[in-house]
Amino acid sequence: MTALVEVVILTYMKTRFFLDNLPPFIMTHPTCSLICSLVHFDRGYEANHLRRAIAETADFNVDGLCNFRLQEVMQNWSEVAELASRLVSSTERDTYDVASFITSTEGAKNRIAIDHGRVFNLTEGREVQILPVFEEYEYNLIMAIVGQNPKEIIVEHTNLSNEMMSTLKHVAGVVYRN
């Protein structure tokens, strides 16, 4: 149950939080990479905080967890959203630079493969779940990949848009094989 609550709060709700608290923008690959970087930023700290909050409560009321037991985490999200708000209207390069910086602070360590549209963490020897967070498949792919702290991304037997390939190159080193 804890893993499910973690996914709901730290992926879906955190994504929704940033989408609701950034100035209006058109979703593009660069802004998606920024949002995904923000969502995965501080994931370890937030997951530990959430586990402690769950252990101390008798029920799994998500609103109660967020509004009372996770106030410190939610305040951090607000501060990050405020800082990121200035980037939404920045250039594509600035957006990618900040997204790359945020991602790199979590420590790039994994080799990732995209093969036939599926994502694999080669370092950990497992398939990565691609959650349906956004309406567009490539944006969900960005979310899945950024969450793996990639140092290298191998793309095989998968046709991705030029924008997606450009985004991946800003996230980590890319090897393209067909």
Residue ranges and their predicted role:
Residues 1-139:
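Conserved mixed alpha/beta catalytic, RNA-binding, or beta-rich assembly cores of soluble enzyme
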Residues 117-178:
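C-terminal structured domains
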